[in-house]
UniProtKB/Swiss-Prot annotation:
Component of the ISW1A complex, which at least consists of ISW1 and IOC3. Component of the ISW1B complex, which at least consists of ISW1, IOC2 and IOC4. The gene is ISW1. One of its GO terms (cellular component) is nucleolar chromatin. One of its GO terms (molecular function) is hydrolase activity. The modification Phosphoserine is found at residue 846. It is an enzyme of class 3 (hydrolase). This is ISWI chromatin-remodeling complex ATPase ISW1. The keyword Nucleotide-binding applies. Residues 144-177, 683-705, 1073-1129 are annotated as: Disordered. Belongs to the SNF2/RAD54 helicase family. ISWI subfamily. Signal peptide: none annotated. Present with 1500 molecules/cell in log phase SD medium.
C-alpha cells in the first residue's frame, strides 16, 4: 500500500508540473477544464492516502463507507444540483428546438467515412435534398483535399516511412492534448456501487465511444447480459466524468419501471431519479414539482405516459433519450414513434434483446430514429440492400450490411461472454395425436372444406384461414380446449385428462423422469386456457406449482416468482404464458424449459427460454419443444427455424442485425400450405398416432403407454435433420424462401401432384354441409366469366338516414330537411327503394303487409321529392351549428351520473369530473340546454329518476349530518355521556355495546358522512384504538358491517330530530362552512398525529391520540363546528 501511495504521489506531481507548463499557452476555457481535472487527481490522491491511513491505524471501512469515499473524487466539478440551476440547463430556450450543429454533424460524418466508404452513398443522397448537408459535404471534401496535400502517394498501397508514421503519432498526440482525457475503463468504474463483468465494461466503453463521436446506437445484447446495468454505468460516466448530470429520459415497458428505478438507486444511489406514473392528478403534481421544477436527473416513464404527457416532456432539452425494448418504435408510423421524434435530444440510445423481428424496413426505422440525418430515405435503403441472384452478390451484401451496422449496434450472446454459463440443449419432441385429437382435427378440416381444399376460384380471406389455423393448433394442444369435448357432467380429474392429448402423455412421462433427477421445470404455452388444464394435471399428479399469465396481478406475479425462487422451494412446476411470462422474469432456479407450443415469432420463444438460461444459472438448461407431427405445428416450427437461420447468418456473424425483407409468414398461400400439411394422414388413418387407447372418465385406467427413450432418440434425429436443412441456405434463399420452393426440384414443379395427394382424401366422404357447399362452383364460374366487368354496382345506393342522437339536442326541423335531401338524392340518381331501405328507415317490421305499405310510401316520397330551396339550405346550415354534436354517449352517461352524485346545480363539480374532455363553459351550456329540453331526450324519465334518486340521497345525508351534529352538541363529552332516545333493537345474539355505538357516531362525525370511504376510515380507527385492543368482535368488523350499523344508528337520530330539522338556505350555508372547518381540523389532526409518531413510541402515541379524541378532541371539534350565535339543546 505504501508503494502504491508513493507511485500516486509521483504521478500527481508529474501531472501538476505538466499542467503548469501547458497553462502558459492555453486559453481560459482550457485552463478551467484542466483545473477541474487537477482537482479530480488531487481528490484521488487524498482518497488513497486516507485508505492508507485507515489500514495503518487498524480501522476497517465498511463497503458503504468505501463506496462513498470512492465517489468523492467524481463529485468534484459537478454543476450545482438545485432546481434553479437545472432550469437554465434543462428547459428549452427556443421553442423551435436546437439549431443545426454543423461542427457535430461534420465530426459524425467524418468518423463514419473513416470506417467505411459505404456511408458516402447515404450522405450524398441526403446532401442532394438538403442544402445544410451539402455544406457538411463541402467541409468534408475540403478536409480531404487538405489531407491529400500533405502526402503525395496516399492512394498507393505501400509501407509507411518513418516520417509519415511520426507525423501520424504527432497528430494523435495533438488530438489528445486538445481534448479532455478520453476514458477507457479497464476495470469496473469506482462510481458504480458494485462490480461489472469484463464484457459489461467493454459495453460501457462502446457506449462512451459512441458518445465521443456523437453517434447514437443500439445496445442489443442477448437477454440476461445486463443491458440495464451497462446503461446505468454509462449514465454514470456522463455524470461523473463528462460532468453532465442530466436530463435523461428512460422509456420502458410499464412492468419494468420499478426495476429501472431500483437498479439506478442500487448502482448509482447519488442520481436523482423518479418514475412519472399515477393517475391524472398524481402525474400533474409530479410534472409541476419534479419535471418542470427541474428537480431530477433521470425521468423514467412508460410508452403510454410518454404519449399522454408529451406536451410537458417536449419542454425539456434532453441530453439522452433511452428506449428499452426499442422494437416498439420499429414502425415509424406508430403514435409512440411520431411523438418521440418531436422531442429534442442531443443523443439517443436504443436497448433491445431482439433488434429486429421482421424486415429491412424496420431496421431502417430504428436507424432513422437514431440518425435521421444519415438514414433519411427508406426506399434508398431498401434498394441499396436488395439481394441479387448470384452467391457472390449475396456474400457482398452481407459484408456491406456488417460494415454499415457495425458502428451503431453492439450484440453479444451468452456463449461468447459468459464462459460459466453452459449452452442450452434444445430438442423438438415430435408427438402424434390421440384418437380424440384425430377426430377433432378431422372435424375442423371438414367444417371449412372449401377453404382447406383451396378449390374456390376466389382466394379465401386471410381471417378465415387464420381461424382454421388457430382451431387446429388448439386441437394439437388438447382437445378439451373445445367446449363440449370433455366428457361430463360429472367432470372428473382422471387419467382421461392425460391420455386424450398426446402432448400431455409425453409431458407426463417427461415430468416424472425430471422429478426423479431433481430438476425443476418451466412450462410455457400461448394459451392461458391450456394452463387451466395443466393446473388440473398438476393437482392430479400432486405436483406443486406456480402460475403467471396475462391476467395475473402485479403483486401476485412477484409473489409467485419469489415462492418459486425461494431456497428449498418445493414448487416443481411453473406454468407461464409465453408473452406474459417471457419478459422481465428471472427463474434461474429452474433448469428445464418445456415449450408446450410454438409462437409465431421465434424471438418470443427465445425470450421464454432465457428466463432460465441466463447469468446465475448453475446447471445446463434443457429445452423441450413439443410438436405435433404431421400437423400445422410442424410447418410453424419450420417457419421459425427459417427466421432464426436468417438471424444466425446476418446478425451473429459481426454481432450486427438484419432481418430479411420476407413474404409474411401468415400470408394466405403460406397459411393454406400449413393447414393442408398432414391433412392426408388424418383422413387416411383412423387410429391414433400417439395413443390408440383412450380410457373412460372415472375408470382409473391408463391408455397405451409410450416409450419415452425411443421417442427422445427419434426426435433428436429429426431435430438434427431440420437444423441441417436450413444451415445450407444462403441469404438470398432465405429472403425469397417460401413453402413452394420445397416442391421444386430439377426444374420441375411437383406442387400440384402433392396437393392432389393431400386433398383427394378430404373429398372421399364429404359431409352434407360440404355437399351443399359444392354449389359454390357457380360463384366460381360467375367470377371467371365476368373478369372484365367492373365490380362497381350498376346503380348507386340510396343514402342512409342521418343518425340523430337525442342527447345532442339538435333542432327537430333539421331531421326533416335531411330526409328531404335524402329523397331528392335518390330521385336524382334514379334509385328505386327496396325492402332494405324500409328496414334502414323504419327498423324491423314483422308484419309483411305493413312492410309493403312502408315501401310504397318510400317510393312515393322519392317520386314527389324536391330539392332544398335556398332558404332551406341556409336554415340547414344554421341548424347544423346548433345542438351539441360534440357530446358522445359516454360523456352523456357520465353527465347523468355526476349530476346525481353532486346535484344538478353543482356545475363546477360536474365539470371537474368531465375534464379534460369538456370545459366548465361547455358543461354549463349543456346543463342549461338539458334541463330546458329534457322532454326531447329519449327515455328522459329514466335519466330524470336517476338524478332525482341520487339528489334525495344527498339531501338525506345532509339531514343525517345535521342530526348527528345536534346530538353531539348536547354533551360536553359525548364519548362517555351520549344516549340515544330511540336505541336500536337488540334482538340479535351478538350486538354492539353502547360504547362501540358512540365511537362509531363520533368517527362518522369526524370524517363526514359525505365521504365514500368513511367506513374504511372508521374501521382503521377501531383497529388503532387501544380501548378495543381486546374486543375481537368489534375489531374484526368489515366496512360493510360497520356501514350497516352506522345506518341503523343514523336512522335512530333521524327519528329523534325528524320534526326539528329544516334545510333552509341559512342552514345549508352553515353546513358548508362547517364542512370546510371540519376539513381544516382533520388536516391539523393528521399533522399532529404524524409529529407524535416521530417523537414517541407507537403505543404511547395511540394512547395520546385516543385520550385527545375522547376527552378534548370531540369537545373542541363540536365546539368549532357550532356557530357562536346558536344555542344548544
Amino acid at each position: 500500500m505504501a508503494y502504491m501511495l508513493a507511485i500516486a504521489n509521483f504521478h500527481f506531481f508529474k501531472f501538476y508540473t505538466r499542467m503548469r507548463k501547458k497553462h502558459e499557452n492555453n486559453s481560459c476555457n482550457e485552463k478551467d477544464k484542466d483545473e477541474n481535472l487537477f482537482k479530480i487527481i488531487l481528490a484521488i490522491f487524498l482518497q488513497e492516502k486516507k485508505k492508507y491511513d485507515c489500514i495503518s491505524s487498524g480501522s476497517i471501512m465498511t463497503a458503504s463507507e468505501e463506496y462513498l469515499e470512492n465517489l468523492k473524487p467524481f463529485q468534484v466539478g459537478l454543476p450545482p444540483h438545485d432546481p434553479e440551476s437545472n432550469k437554465k440547463r434543462y428547459l428549452l430556450k427556443d421553442a423551435n428546438g436546437k439549431k443545426f450543429d454543423l461542427e457535430g454533424t461534420t465530426k459524425r460524418f467524418e468518423h463514419l467515412l473513416s470506417l467505411s466508404g459505404l456511408f458516402k452513398h447515404f450522405i450524398e443522397s441526403k446532401a442532394a435534398k438538403d442544402p445544410k448537408f451539402r455544406q457538411v459535404l463541402d467541409v468534408l471534401e475540403e478536409n480531404k483535399a487538405n489531407g491529400k496535400g500533405k502526402g503525395k502517394h496516399q492512394d498507393v498501397r505501400r509501407r509507411k516511412t518513418e516520417h509519415e508514421e511520426d507525423a501520424e503519432l504527432l497528430k494523435e498526440e495533438d488530438s489528445d492534448d486538445d481534448e479532455s482525457i478520453e476514458f477507457q475503463f479497464r476495470e469496473s468504474p469506482a462510481y458504480v456501487n458494485g462490480q461489472l463483468r469484463p464484457y459489461q465494461i467493454q459495453g460501457v466503453n462502446w457506449l462512451v465511444s459512441l458518445h465521443k463521436n456523437k453517434i447514437a446506437g443500439i445496445l442489443a445484447d442477448e437477454m440476461g447480459l445486463g443491458k440495464t446495468l451497462q446503461t446505468i454505468s454509462f449514465l454514470g460516466y456522463l455524470r461523473y466524468i463528462e460532468k453532465i448530470p442530466g436530463p435523461f429520459l428512460v422509456i420502458a415497458p410499464k412492468s419494468t419501471l420499478n426495476n429501472w428505478l431500483r437498479e439506478i438507486n442500487r448502482w448509482t444511489p447519488d442520481v436523482n431519479a423518479f418514475i412519472l406514473q399515477g393517475d391524472k392528478e398524481e402525474r400533474a403534481e409530479l410534472i409541476q414539482k419534479k419535471l418542470l421544477g427541474c428537480d431530477f436527473d433521470v425521468v423514467i416513464a412508460s410508452y403510454e405516459i410518454i404519449i399522454r404527457e408529451k406536451s410537458p416532456l417536449k419542454k425539456i432539452n434532453w441530453e439522452y433519450i433511452i428506449i428499452d425494448e426499442a422494437h416498439r418504435i420499429k414502425n415509424e408510423e406508430s403514435m409512440l414513434s411520431q411523438v418521440l421524434r418531436e422531442f429534442t435530444s442531443r443523443n439517443r440510445l436504443l436497448i433491445t434483446g431482439t433488434p429486429l423481428q421482421n424486415n429491412l424496413h424496420e431496421l431502417w426505422a430504428l436507424l432513422n430514429f437514431l440518425l435521421p440525418d444519415i438514414f433519411s430515405d427508406a426506399q434508398d435503403f431498401d434498394d441499396w440492400f436488395s439481394s441479387e441472384s448470384t452467391e457472390e452478390d449475396q456474400d457482398k451484401i452481407v459484408k456491406q450490411l456488417h460494415t454499415v451496422l457495425q458502428p451503431f449496434l453492439l450484440r453479444r450472446i451468452k456463449s461468447d461472454v459468459e464462459t460459466s454459463l453452459l449452452p442450452k440443449k434444445e430438442l423438438n419432441l415430435y408427438v402424434g395425436m390421440s384418437s380424440m385429437q384425430k377426430k377433432w382435427y378431422k372435424k375442423i378440416l371438414e367444417k371449412d372444406l372449401d377453404a382447406v381444399n383451396g378449390s374456390n376460384g376466389s382466394k379465401e380471406s386471410k381471417t378465415r384461414l387464420l381461424n382454421i389455423m388457430m382451431q387446429l393448433r388448439k386441437c394439437c394442444n388438447h382437445p378439451y380446449l373445445f367446449d363440449g369435448a370433455e366428457p361430463g357432467p360429472p367432470y372428473t380429474t382422471d387419467e382421461h385428462l392425460v391420455y386424450n392429448a398426446a402432448k400431455l402423455q409425453v409431458l407426463d412421462k417427461l415430468l416424472k423422469k425430471l422429478k426423479e433427477e431433481g430438476s425443476r421445470v418451466l412450462i410455457f404455452s400461448q394459451m392461458s386456457r391450456l394452463l387451466d388444464i395443466l393446473e388440473d394435471y398438476c393437482y392430479f399428479r400432486n405436483y406443486e406449482y406456480c402460475r403467471i399469465d396475462g391476467s395475473t396481478a402485479h403483486e401476485d406475479r412477484i409473489q409467485a416468482i419469489d415462492d418459486y425462487n425461494a431456497p428449498d422451494s418445493k414448487k416443481f412446476v411453473f406454468l407461464l404464458t409465453t408473452r406474459a411470462g417471457g419478459l422481465g422474469i428471472n427463474l434461474t432456479s429452474a433448469d428445464v424449459v418445456v415449450l408446450y407450443d410454438s409462437d409465431w415469432n421465434p424471438q418470443a420463444d427465445l425470450q421464454a427460454m432465457d428466463r432460465a438460461h441466463r447469468i446465475g444459472q448453475k446447471k445446463q438448461v434443457k429445452v423441450f419443444r413439443l410438436v405435433t407431427d404431421n400437423s400445422v405445428e410442424e410447418k410453424i416450427l419450420e417457419r421459425a427455424t427459417q427466421k432464426l437461420r436468417l438471424d444466425q447468418l446476418v446478425i451473429q456473424q459481426n454481432r450486427t442485425s438484419l432481418k430479411k425483407k420476407e413474404n409474411k409468414a401468415d400470408s394466405k398461400d403460406a397459411l393454406l400450405s400449413m393447414i393442408q400439411h398432414g391433412a392426408a394422414d388424418v383422413f387416411k388413418s383412423g387410429t391414433s398416432t400417439g395413443s390408440a387407447g383412450t380410457p373412460e372418465p372415472g375408470s382409473g385406467e391408463k391408455g397405451d403407454d409410450i416409450d419415452l427413450d425411443e421417442l427422445l432418440l427419434k426426435s433428436e434425429n429429426k431435430t438434427k435433420s431440420l437444423n441441417a436443412k436450413y444451415e445450407t441456405l444462403g441469404l438470398d434463399d432465405l429472403q425469397k424462401f417460401n413453402q413452394d420452393s420445397a416442391y421444386e426440384w430439377n426444374g420441375q414443379d411437383f406442387k400440384k401432384k402433392i396437393q392432389r395427394d393431400i386433398i383427394s382424401p378430404l373429398l372421399l366422404n364429404p359431409t352434407k354441409r360440404e355437399r351443399k357447399e359444392n354449389y359454390s362452383i357457380d360463384n366460381y364460374y360467375k367470377d371467371v366469366l365476368n373478369t372484365g366487368r367492373s365490380s362497381t354496382p350498376s346503380h348507386p345506393r340510396m343514402p342512409k338516414p342521418h343518425v340523430f342522437h337525442s342527447h345532442q339536442l339538435q333542432p327537430p326541423q333539421l331531421k326533416v330537411l335531411y330526409e328531404k335531401e335524402r329523397m331528392w338524392t335518390a330521385k336524382k340518381t334514379g334509385y328505386v327503394p327496396t325492402m332494405d331501405d324500409v328496414k334502414a328507415a323504419y327498423g324491423d317490421i314483422s308484419d309483411e303487409e305493413e312492410k309493403k305499405q312502408k315501401l310504397e310510401l318510400l317510393k312515393l316520397s322519392v317520386n314527389n321529392s324536391q330539392p332544398l330551396t335556398e332558404e332551406e339550405e341556409k336554415m340547414k346550415a344554421d341548424w347544423e351549428s346548433e345542438g351539441f354534436t360534440n357530446w358522445n354517449k359516454l360523456e352523456f352517461r357520465k353527465f347523468i351520473t355526476v349530476s346525481g352524485k353532486y346535484g344538478r346545480n353543482s356545475i363546477q363539480a360536474i365539470a371537474r369530473e368531465l375534464a379534460p374532455g369538456k370545459t366548465l363553459e361547455e358543461v354549463r351550456a349543456y346543463a342549461k340546454a338539458f334541463w330546458s329540453n329534457i322532454e326531447r331526450i329519449e327515455d328522459y324519465e329514466k335519466y330524470l329518476k336517476i338524478i332525482e334518486n341520487e339528489e334525495e340521497k344527498i339531501k338525506r345525508v345532509k339531514m343525517q349530518q345535521e342530526a348527528l351534529r345536534r346530538k353531539l352538541s348536547e354533551y360536553k363529552n359525548p364519548f362517555f355521556d351520549l344516549k340515544l332516545k330511540h336505541p336500536p333493537s337488540s334482538n340479535n345474539k351478538r350486538t354492539y355495546s353502547e360504547e362501540e355505538d358512540r365511537f362509531i357516531l363520533l368517527m362518522l362525525f369526524k370524517y363526514g358522512l359525505d365521504r365514500d370511504d368513511v367506513y374504511e376510515l372508521v374501521r382503521d380507527e377501531i383497529r388503532d384504538c387501544p380501548l378495543f385492543e381486546l374486543d375481537f368482535y368489534f375489531r374484526s368488523r368489515t366496512p360493510v358491517e360497520l356501514a350497516r350499523r352506522g345506518n341503523t344508528l343514523l336512522q335512530c337520530l333521524e327519528k329523534e330530530f325528524n320534526a326539528g330539522i329544516v334545510l333552509d338556505d341559512a342552514t345549508k350555508d352553515r353546513m358548508k362552512k362547517e364542512d370546510e372547518n371540519g376539513k381544516r381540523i382533520r388536516e391539523e389532526f393528521a399533522d399532529q398525529t404524524a409529529n407524535e409518531k416521530e417523537n414517541v413510541d407507537g403505543v404511547e402515541s395511540k394512547k395520546a391520540k385516543i385520550e385527545d379524541t375522547s376527552n378534548v378532541g370531540t369537545e373542541q371539534l363540536v365546539a368549532e363546528k357550532i356557530p357562536e350565535n346558536e344555542t344548544t339543546h
